[in-house]
């Protein structure tokens, strides 16, 4: 079964491609029935229909016409495979033949360009922290000014700058600089802000219709958002004239920085005039919030920033209060249909751990860099505005993902950058048991891109111990993903993907053969990361171990109490090592990482597809030598040899490691001697391959060039399986890794032992 082909066509990968026929049987499988779905996956041959989709008339279904529907040409009707309702086809579908079938009856994934145009262009609201040092602020200003040329000419733009006060800039005046100034230590409310900025009191009736488009006047709230083509010169001038915060910072104190208040004011201004309109709040922060709501740390330097240990031991003084503030703000921003992006440019933590819900529930970007002057920030920020072949931004707005299922399936939840859509009546295909964001069959993505991938989990409805599937035709479970969104071209679009999975009785060998161990590993990793947000890290590791043992007991071949007889079929053989590397990954092992770094790593992991997620779990290692062609090698200390160059890709950084002998030759300058042209080309090969990896990676990875004995070689050694550690003898020519971590060999040996002994 070609799992990757299905992903290329439909953007979906299931853990089990054949489903057990009952819930009891599915529970025995240990790994839940789930899939990784990339709604806007790029395809050259995507079927695009320039008309509205045909929708099922059942008000509780509303699924879309697809290739699995039964068509009755004589009566011009179609039967919905999801709910079995019979529907009348539109008149222009009459008299169709096998040769003239519409796109939606021949393609499992179709994109519809609907007839409803987008009313308001996207809004980009920049929030700039001016407490940055001069060099850092200068680099940031240059990046923002450059990015203006990448925005659509009709895009609306706004600007807030802040230190311990918040300045909301009015771009409507070309001759003078006007701005409204707010206190940074206060949490403003919507009615209060509207009255201050417009002079009008906001009553309940106005609050309901607050998003009604109004003409821009000198006193209207929407005067703060004007078309880029009108105000680009003014905005560029304002940015160029920005100076670092003029307030004196006393010795032993941090700058006063009202980040929480700035974000709150930005969300309120947008809510006041552009609720449920595509908008991005883009924050550039150069340090932690030290004043006002959402305060991360006090201004005094003697008060250190919280660590993981402080958070776990409940001794992080401001953490819970800040999290509560930002979580409530995130819910409000998501409800308004807006997105928050956070770009950090400083060596210190800025409070990403507290603010992560702002980006994770709105489809925003969280980027952690050392400074705004680094290549990582500059190039990642510009890639944020990357465009497709037609010149449109590769970002979609106001997305909604609805998942329709046939009566055999219910939805447990979704793990990804989204928020639940609140509905008046609960959909019939929603399970009582939740994984991730549950209790609904529709999720809201204020923003999404071709990279965004969501983990969706299902429950088999039939509770029977072993439901027999005894029919002439194979029993199929149908799932339809309907993604509605605003395309950056100004059109409303609907991407529909419909898939069918066979259901068989437990024990049928087709179920085991349908196991996609790569997708399963990523789905289980997403559950583990989701659990790690609220559970103790050691408990999450134990849960991972127990599920692996149970899966092996179910699907490995072995004789009881005989570890040497343990065998896993090819469909399962890589799964244990994925689990081993997941246990050691920065997503679960937070030792040596700050809370902000952990938030950043988990944010990126929960938005990427199967391939990129696996690179994060188990990095790839490629060996280059004079004797052999470049080849993948084990992520193991035995792969480190004096006469090879290694290329490590962890997704977050790309490292080139020169073995001891290679490093000596390089220092001696052999590559500059024409006699050693082969050696010169050997040094260039990994750089060329690294450049290939960097082409479309977001965010831009850190690039490390090191050698045996170099200080940065630790970045490689920390990722390797320590089969040669100080506790064991080293293989000749390999490297000893100084660690107390269990090696993969010992991990597998213990797994085999507990599996064959019947332990859990």
UniProtKB/Swiss-Prot annotation:
It comes from the Eukaryota. Its main location: cytoplasm. It is a peripheral membrane protein. GO terms for cellular component: COPII vesicle coat; endoplasmic reticulum exit site; endoplasmic reticulum membrane; Golgi membrane. The keyword Endoplasmic reticulum applies. InterPro entries: ADF-H/Gelsolin-like_dom_sf (IPR029006), Gelsolin-like_dom (IPR007123), Gelsolin-like_dom_sf (IPR036180), Sec23 (IPR037364), Sec23/24_helical_dom (IPR006900), Sec23/24_helical_dom_sf (IPR036175), Sec23/24_trunk_dom (IPR006896), Sec23_24_beta_S (IPR012990). One of its GO terms (biological process) is COPII-coated vesicle cargo loading. Keywords: Cytoplasm, Cytoplasmic vesicle, Endoplasmic reticulum, ER-Golgi transport, Golgi apparatus, Membrane, Metal-binding, Protein transport, Transport, Zinc. It is found in: Cytoplasm; Cytoplasmic vesicle, COPII-coated vesicle membrane; Endoplasmic reticulum membrane; Golgi apparatus membrane. GO terms for molecular function: GTPase activator activity; zinc ion binding. Zn(2+) binds at residues 56, 61, 80, 83. Belongs to the SEC23/SEC24 family. SEC23 subfamily. Component of the coat protein complex II (COPII) which promotes the formation of transport vesicles from the endoplasmic reticulum (ER). The coat has two main functions, the physical deformation of the endoplasmic reticulum membrane into vesicles and the selection of cargo molecules. The COPII coat is composed of at least 5 proteins: the SEC23/24 complex, the SEC13/31 complex, and the protein SAR1. This is Protein transport protein SEC23.
């Amino acid at each position: 079964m070609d799992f990757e082909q299905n992903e290329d066509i439909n953007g979906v990968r299931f853990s089990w491609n054949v489903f057990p026929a009952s819930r009891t049987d599915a529970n025995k499988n240990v790994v839940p029935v789930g899939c990784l779905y990339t709604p806007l996956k790029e395809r050259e041959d995507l079927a695009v229909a320039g008309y509205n989709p045909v929708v099922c008339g059942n008000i509780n279904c509303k699924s879309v016409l697809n290739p699995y529907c039964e068509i009755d040409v004589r009566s011009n009707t179609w039967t919905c495979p999801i709910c079995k309702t019979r529907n009348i086809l539109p008149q222009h579908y009459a008299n169709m033949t096998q040769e003239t079938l519409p796109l939606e009856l021949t393609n499992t994934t179709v994109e519809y360009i609907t007839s409803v145009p987008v009313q308001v262009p996207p809004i980009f609201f920049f929030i700039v922290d001016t407490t940055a040092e001069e060099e850092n602020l200068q680099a940031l200003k240059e990046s923002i000014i450059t990015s203006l040329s990448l925005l659509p000419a009709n895009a609306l733009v706004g600007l807030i700058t802040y230190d311990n006060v918040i300045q909301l800039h009015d771009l409507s005046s070309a001759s003078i600089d006007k701005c409204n100034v707010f206190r940074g230590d206060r949490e403003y409310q919507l009615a209060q802000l509207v009255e201050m900025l417009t002079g009008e009191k906001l009553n309940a009736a106005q609050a309901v219709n607050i998003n009604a488009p109004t003409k821009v006047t000198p006193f209207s709230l929407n005067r703060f958002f004007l078309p880029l083509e009108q105000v680009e010169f003014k905005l560029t001038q304002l940015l160029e004239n920005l100076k670092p915060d003029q307030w004196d910072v006393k010795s032993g104190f941090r700058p006063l920085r009202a980040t929480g208040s700035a974000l709150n004011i930005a969300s309120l201004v947008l809510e006041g005039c552009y609720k449920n309109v595509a908008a991005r709040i883009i924050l550039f922060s150069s340090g932690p919030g030290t004043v006002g709501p959402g305060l991360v740390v006090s201004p005094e330097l003697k008060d250190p920033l919280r660590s993981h240990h402080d958070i776990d031991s409940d001794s992080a003084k401001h953490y819970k209060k800040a999290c509560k503030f930002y979580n409530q703000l995130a819910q409000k921003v998501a409800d308004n249909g807006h997105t928050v992006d956070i770009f950090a440019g400083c060596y210190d933590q800025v409070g990403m751990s507290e603010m992560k819900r702002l980006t994770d529930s709105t489809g925003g970007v969280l980027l952690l860099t050392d400074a705004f002057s680094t290549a990582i920030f500059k190039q990642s920020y510009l890639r944020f505005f990357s465009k497709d072949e037609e010149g449109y931004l590769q970002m979609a707005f106001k997305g909604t993902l609805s998942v329709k299922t046939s009566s055999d399936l219910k939805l447990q939840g979704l793990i990804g950058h989204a928020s639940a859509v609140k509905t008046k009546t609960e959909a019939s295909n929603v399970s009582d048991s939740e994984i991730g964001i549950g209790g609904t069959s529709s999720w809201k993505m204020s923003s999404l891109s071709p990279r965004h991938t969501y983990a969706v989990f299902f429950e088999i409805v039939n509770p029977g111990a072993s439901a027999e599937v005894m029919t002439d035709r194979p029993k199929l479970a149908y799932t339809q993903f309907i993604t509605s969104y605003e395309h950056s071209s100004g059109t409303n679009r609907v991407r529909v993907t419909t898939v069918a999975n066979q259901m068989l009785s437990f024990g049928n060998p087709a179920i085991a053969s349908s196991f996609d161990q790569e997708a399963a590993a990523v789905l289980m990793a997403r559950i583990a990361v989701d659990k790690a947000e609220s559970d103790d890290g050691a408990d999450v590791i134990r849960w991972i171990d127990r599920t692996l043992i149970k899966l092996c007991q179910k699907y490995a071949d072995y004789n009881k109490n005989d570890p040497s007889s343990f065998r896993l079929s090819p469909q399962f053989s890589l799964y244990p090592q994925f689990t081993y590397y997941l246990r050691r990954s920065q997503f679960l092992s937070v030792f040596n990482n700050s809370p902000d770094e952990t938030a950043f790593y988990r944010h990126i992991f929960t938005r990427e597809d199967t391939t990129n997620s696996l690179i994060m779990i188990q990095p790839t290692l490629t060996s280059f030598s004079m004797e052999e062609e470049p080849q993948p090698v084990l992520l193991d200390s035995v792969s480190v040899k004096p006469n090879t160059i290694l290329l490590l890709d962890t997704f977050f950084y790309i490292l080139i490691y020169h073995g001891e002998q290679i490093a000596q030759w390089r220092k001696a300058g052999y590559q500059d001697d024409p006699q050693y042209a082969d050696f010169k080309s050997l040094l260039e090969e990994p750089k060329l391959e690294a450049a290939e990896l960097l082409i479309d990676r977001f965010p831009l990875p850190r690039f490390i060039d090191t050698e045996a004995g170099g200080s940065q070689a630790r970045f490689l050694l920390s990722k390797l399986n320590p089969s040669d550690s100080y506790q064991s003898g080293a293989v000749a020519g390999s490297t000893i890794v100084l660690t107390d971590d269990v090696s993969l060999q010992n991990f597998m040996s213990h797994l085999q032992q507990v599996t064959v002994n019947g332990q859990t």
